[in-house]
Design a protein with these regions (language model features):
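Bacterial Sec signal peptide processing site at the extreme N-terminus
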Residues: 28-50
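Terminal, low-structured helical/coil segments at or just beyond the last alpha-helical repeat
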Residues: 39, 214-265
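Structural marker of alpha-solenoid helical repeat scaffolds
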Residues: 43, 77, 111-112, 145-147, ...
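Canonical tetratricopeptide repeat
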Residues: 53, 87, 121, 155-157, ...
Length: 265
């Protein structure tokens, strides 16, 4: 008895060309679904990045509640974004919640262990809360990271961290390392010169100022430092030289205003 005679329906398999078309259609549908998923994921990632940037902007403006709202949303949109966690760490630091801030920095590091910017941000935080050795260690690791394009900044940051802890000899070594790496890095030159000045080493401080501005473009900080050092040395001609250049080159700077206050003292 045939299948049709027994009451069952039976269809012949589609021809080979039809089967091939079905396979192609299935593949196309699979690719379309994958592409759709990728687009949705990218949309969420883009939204997370956008809200992170907004959150940071609001935080800089001092609007902590709105910053938190944006960063909470960014986290929901992409919990695997290390930039979100770094931003939330800054938020919690501002809110006076150090445990949460530290946890967020560590989350960012777990997600991006080789990202020097993430490590640099954490190092800044560690120095600010007095964990100097940890902060300096991270700054120096960042400086050695081949992915970090400005190692002189990391060395200088390590110096600032050490200086804030009154570890001046170690700070000076880091400022010098920054200048070896980038001789025209004005911030390190200023920090080293000011460190010498505060330590009473007027000759070394003056040499630091003159060496830098003799080779590179002067900055307001270095010129004002030159004024202060020359005044301490009793060198009136040098005082007038630095002061004139500061007034002419940077008339609206905060350092020029500070110079006016010095003149009244």
């Amino acid at each position: 008895m045939s299948a049709r005679q027994a009451g069952f329906t039976s269809e012949a398999p589609p021809p080979r060309s039809a089967r091939a078309a079905l396979v192609v259609l299935a593949a196309v549908l699979g690719l379309a679904a994958c592409a759709s998923h990728e687009r949705a994921t990218k949309k969420k990632d883009d939204a997370s990045t956008y809200n992170t940037q907004l959150g940071i902007a609001y935080l800089r403006q001092g609007d902590v509640p709105l910053a938190k709202e944006k960063l909470d949303r960014a986290l929901r949109e992409n919990p695997g974004n290390p930039e979100v966690h770094s931003a939330r760490a800054m938020l919690f630091d501002r809110m006076g919640e150090p445990a949460k801030a530290d946890a967020e920095y560590r989350a960012a590091l777990r997600l991006a262990p080789q990202d020097p910017d993430v490590s640099n941000n954490y190092a800044v935080y560690l120095c600010q809360i007095g964990r100097t050795d940890e902060g300096v260690h991270r700054f120096e690791a960042v400086a050695r990271n081949a992915l970090y394009r400005t190692p002189w900044v990391a060395y200088s940051n390590a110096g600032v961290c050490l200086r804030s802890a009154k570890r001046n000899a170690e700070a000076a070594r880091n400022f010098k390392q920054a200048l070896l790496t980038r001789p025209n890095f004005a911030e390190a030159a200023y920090q080293l010169g000011d460190l010498e000045f505060q330590g009473g080493n007027l000759t070394d401080a003056r040499a630091q100022v003159d060496t830098y501005i003799g080779a590179f473009e002067a900055t307001p900080d270095l010129l004002l430092l030159g004024v202060r050092v020359a005044r301490a040395q009793g060198d009136r001609l040098a005082v007038e030289h630095y002061a004139r250049k500061l007034r002419l080159d940077f008339p609206s700077s905060a350092q020029t205003h500070a110079l006016a206050e010095l003149d009244h003292n």
